[in-house]
Amino acid sequence: MDTADRTEAKPAPKRPDRVKPGQHVIISLRRMIAQGRFAPGERIGEIATAETLGVSRMPVRTALRALEAEGLVEKLGARGYAARSMTSAEVEGAIEVRGVLEGLAARRLAARGLSAAEDMRFCECLARGEAIFARGTLAQGDVDAFHDYNRAFHALLVAASGNPSIAEAIARNDHLPFASSSALALESDPASEFAHLHSAHRDHVDVMDAIRRRDEERAERAMRVHARAALGSERLFRRLVPQG
């Protein structure tokens, strides 16, 4: 983030000022795939994509490898990568499975109760989310910061569940298209993008409220609803072939 972004930040809460190098390339490419910029099977040219995004070829190549792990692109041997063909049913099924698994994690944590250390970690994590939305608009770097915050929240929840099998099952499921909690299908309109991400943050707050109240059913239900919210983006399904 540049100097101007740091000086505009409100002192409380502190705004995120570090993002992973090249992460914005992954997010941008994921959005292009979700919006149907590449037809299924179409080769994604590294040079053309790098020029479109205003970066060198290396971060594009790194991003494509990451998106291959997410099931969004497939390797074409020495020819690079192509957008993977997928159906709405495939995406819905993968997201539903994630909701079930993360819902189980939330339920287990609500049943056991948070330790003081766990509660502190979740408080610190949610504070990162609050900082992102404090100004009511998304500034440069905020989408990247949300990506990190969102991934941290989901990882904390699954780890705190105390069941390693949940994490293993989620890791396997994450190789399916748009199944990962990190596979954000973002809006191109800034106002819609803010609303979409802010809604996801409020879901996190709701889940944690249920966990702190030891309400197992509500915690599980809230986490499932949160996962299915990804299906609400029309752009996510614009390029998908309907499953009849």
PLM regions: where:
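Conserved amphipathic alpha-helical segments that form helical-bundle/coiled-coil interaction surfaces
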Residues: 116-185, 203-206, 218-229
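C-terminal all-alpha effector/ligand-binding and dimerization domain
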Residues: 2, 17, 180-244
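Alpha-helix N-cap/N′ positions at the starts of helices
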Residues: 78, 101, 124, 199-202
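General structural signal for alpha-helix termini and helix-helix connectors
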Residues: 35, 107, 111, 131-139, ...
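A generic short alpha-helical patch detector that favors 3-5-residue windows
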Residues: 17, 21, 93, 97, ...
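Short linear motifs at protein or domain termini
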Residues: 1-111, 165, 236-244
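Helix-loop "lid/cap" segments that line or gate small-molecule binding pockets
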Residues: 102-114, 155-162, 210
